[in-house]
Design a protein with these regions (language model features):
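Structured catalytic core of nucleotide-sugar glycosyltransferases
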Residues: 1-104
Length: 104
């Protein structure tokens, strides 16, 4: 049986480190990747849309900033309800603090 371990990345107003991290995770064949836009605003929509459309990330959005804890809870609930064979989750920060080597 194949198990699922989603990688959850909450993000508020991401910089270039988030797309870089996602590309590295995809190259390492680590997925699914669930990103929570925690109320970043319209000026960041393009970054999130690209990650969803071009890199296959699952994008969850909060209309306003609710904080990292609420963003994680939102993603955990999504994963519990959508990944049948999930055995756990990995969380990573969008600023590149956690490397692919650390995550893997």
């Amino acid at each position: 049986m194949n198990y699922t371990i989603p990688i959850i990345i909450p993000s508020l107003e991401p910089d270039e480190n988030l797309p870089k991290l996602v590309k590295e995770l995809k190259q390492a064949e680590l997925s699914p990747i669930v990103i929570v836009d925690d109320g970043s605003g319209k000026e960041y929509r393009g970054i999130f849309d690209e990650l969803e459309q071009e890199h296959g990330c699952i994008l969850l959005r909060n209309a306003v900033n609710l904080g990292k804890g609420r963003a994680l809870k939102y993603a955990f609930n999504f994963c519990i309800n959508n990944f049948e064979n999930m055995i756990g989750c990995i969380t990573a920060d969008s600023d590149g603090q956690h490397t692919v080597e650390c995550i893997n």
